[in-house]
Amino acid sequence: MNPTTFHKSRLATSIALVLGVAMPGYAVADDAAAAKEDKIEVITVTGIRGSLIKSMDTKRESEGILDAISAEDIGKFPDTNLAESLQRITGVSIDRVNGEGSKVTVRGFGPDFNLVTLNGRQMPVTTGSRSFDFANISSDSISGVEVHKTALASNPTGGIGSTIDVQTLRPLDSPGTKAIASVAAVDDRSTDKGSATPEVSALYSNTFNDNKFGILLSGSYQERESGNQQANVGTGWRSFLGKVDDNWGAGTAEWGGVPQGNQVNRPSADEVYSVPQTTIYKFEEQQRKRTNGQLVLQYSPRDDIKATLDYTYMRNDIDTQYNDVSAWFTFAPSSSVWTDGPISSPLVYSETYDAKQDLSMGAGDYGVRNESGSLGFNLEWEVNDKLSLTFDAHTSDAENKPNSPNGSNSSLSTAGFVRTYAATDFSGDLPVLAVGGGNAVTPQDMRVTGSVFGSARNKSEIDQVQFDGDYTLNDESNIDFGIALTTVDNHSQSVNVQRNDWGGVGKAGDLDPSWFPAETIHDKFTANGGNFSAFTGKSFDVLNKIFMWDFERVRAQAEKLYTPAGYKGKGDCGTDFCPSSDYASDTDRYTEEESQSAYVQYNYRNDWKGKPYDLHVGLRYEQTDVTSTSAVAAYDRADWIADTEIALHASGKREFQTQQGDYDYLLPSINFNIEIVEDVMLRAAYSETIGRPDYVSIQGGTVVGTLANRSGGSGSSGNPSLLPLESQNYDFSAEWYYAEASYLSAGYFRKNVTNFITNLKVDSTIYNLANPADGKKYREALAAVGADAAAIRNWIFANYPNDPSVNVPGKVISGKAGEDNTMIFKIDTPSNGAEEETIDGWEFAIQHAFGETGFGTILNYTMVDSGVEYDNFILKDQPALVGLSDTANVILFYENNGLQARIAYNWRDEFLNSRGQDTGANPKYTEAYSQIDASVSYDLPQVKGLTVYLEALNITDEYIRVHGRAKEQVLNLTEAGSRYSIGARYSF
């Protein structure tokens, strides 16, 4: 079958059919002899209780194991953020960005392995992952969300953890006139500069012509100002076996290795230790404007046919500004205090310098726009009593692009060269940095150093056609069947304008001191840190000063002073102090993924000894072709520009490559449900599912970092031939629906997963660049002055001032072919492993409404275990599953006499969130986190339809902390604060 012909002919046929049924000759009049219906009073339960009843009914009547969340009323979802609502479901946990729910993990499988659909349609994403960002969509037009934890043949593939279907409102589902408007003010306590921001939304739904035609129009606009405080260890921690030191002459050294002497409790030879690359304090402000809109048109000329045309629009503009202060460790001779092994970490890590080093203070100001649209058409046709058909087609696109004169990411650095030593105490939650001379730094000391202006544009397009049918065999059985064609096109482009003047340019007095207001650091954090008590015999001056300088003023001054006359820069402005839109000069990647699928499912319902049961046996076939074309920047020289940085010089040329991959799977599924006693359901299921690799992993081409170090460079390469993860799934569940809005459930799940994707580090001499830190001059300097990078560079400047590869005024040493060894790049390449990993767990939930009191509670707990955990003692990548953690929720609610109140406690245990840092195969663990949210609303009796409400998130100001192989190896601590909103909602 020709897929293109199928797409066109089916769509054309369906549209013709819709037009045809509207023709007077085909649309016969309603039966005039129909009996007049008796008037029956229908009581509709809304609010919290109504939402819980509807969700419980959906769960009870499902063909597999499923959880659901339903709107409390039209246009009113339990939370303003969908991810915040989803985390209340058993086994679901979320990731937050700037304090707001963003992505979900289900049963230990991270966002990439949970397929999110909108009305059953796959949605495009622009992050290179497969995870949908729930922060982009408003909940105002959402009718419900279903989380399918077991697979059915009719479900699309891609979700090993779950398939999450977000369902939007449809006018014919709620006939009549409906109109809702709401307004709110949001106070985000995480920002010191912002103020209360508005949220407005409106929804109009109506049906006409005896409910045969319906229209729904909804829109929302939200502004939000937020901020956060971060403490980071930059690119991460470098890990070594204890035998590694800084003795290059003995052959036991690696870059970052600590001396054998002058240490307290130094790790032994067979232990593993880690050293930090830097310590950074970062203070960020963010402004967001989110716009959502949806138009739905429905036409049902007869009871047996219904056509739906819908368009959904989402836009999220995010502007970010930040200031930071940092001290980069140069791995000069260090003196440190260590924890006990076998995984050893510094309680205090310190370095002392012969020459003063930089105390860096950077700033950024940039913006991005995320924009997406989806146009869909759906036709449902009950052909006769036995056969019903559904056709669905949509074309959707999403784009992420710069939305600022400074690009999608910008960084400009200044520095005062005052640092005589640097030390960090890692004994507390907050890393505490001490810098010799740091608190005495003045605005006059600051000089402009390096800068990066980046522009990234990512676009994803999905065209999907689905044809489904249901054929009834008899009263007990029917067959579901269908075919689909899905094409996903991803295009990612990026270009950087980078200055590598990290040694500083200009002179004192170039920058106006009034542009550099000083502020203190530690009063901005609530987390506690150490006080260097583990280090005896020396006092440290804890850094408590940062210049919160204005990005634009310094950028403009630097552009004016440090752009040579006649110089043509790479930026669109003609200098190197702005971004470029010349994507053709840098990285350009295009990937097409085309999937064809077909399924058949047999459904059987009967009684066994008076106990109703249903059986669903299905088979799904998936065939996928991947084509990736890439063009990446090439480099022709390596320049040693600072103690710890070797910059790569772009040649202006690009390398082109096209790669392909394909795979196909036959995926069975069995779901069995029986009401073993009245109101008690037992369920059992077996299925085989796949989870496709993220889009970045299947992109072709090798991209290297533009900054290397003395040990070489790094980079990454995609692999279009990657296979999906494969999982054999076993599920069992028992559910007791003992009262209205009340149930108790327990479930067990087991997943045997193969084809785990791991990153192999491959040594490559790509570009054949001479390494200036690995050659004749370097070895002579090493023998003369030792391993300190600053001393080595100064020795080369002093002894080779006339060498063409040595630029003494510019403080640059370039690689020299024939004299220096070729630079080695560690290239991360994803590949499928042969290991099998078993993930299993238990889920427990109780939902109870206390009669007519109005009180109720929801309690759930999920335990997840893996047969293979990350081994912190192994220094290479491992096939460990990220996102695996236990979770719990406690929700108390009250609803009576127009008053609704809810308080929710959410907890997630520590979990592995990544198997790699920028320094290589070093793990990242997100520590256990809990959050308390609350909301209260009141229906004003004086004005029918008017509700006022108050919401509060993260009431106790919890923060998120990430560490490496040990708790002391902090990578990131982020404090995002609490958020409050007050508003009113009017429906009529």
Labelled PLM ranges:
Residues 370-372, 591, 661, 690-747, ...:
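Outer-membrane beta-barrel signature, preferentially recognizing the C-terminal barrel domain
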Residues 44-75, 103, 111-114, 121:
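N-terminal periplasmic "start-of-domain" segments of outer-membrane beta-barrel proteins
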Residues 194-334, 367-378, 383, 388-389, ...:
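Transmembrane beta-barrel wall of Gram-negative outer-membrane proteins
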Residues 752, 757-762, 768-916, 956:
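Gram-negative outer-membrane beta-barrel transporters
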Residues 6-9, 14, 28, 452-454, ...:
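Conserved C-terminal beta-signal and adjacent last beta-strands/turns
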Residues 83-122:
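Extracytoplasmic beta-strand/coil segments of soluble accessory domains associated
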Residues 82-85, 102-105, 117, 133, ...:
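N-terminal periplasmic accessory domains that precede
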Residues 121-149:
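Short acidic/polar hinge/loop motifs at secondary-structure boundaries
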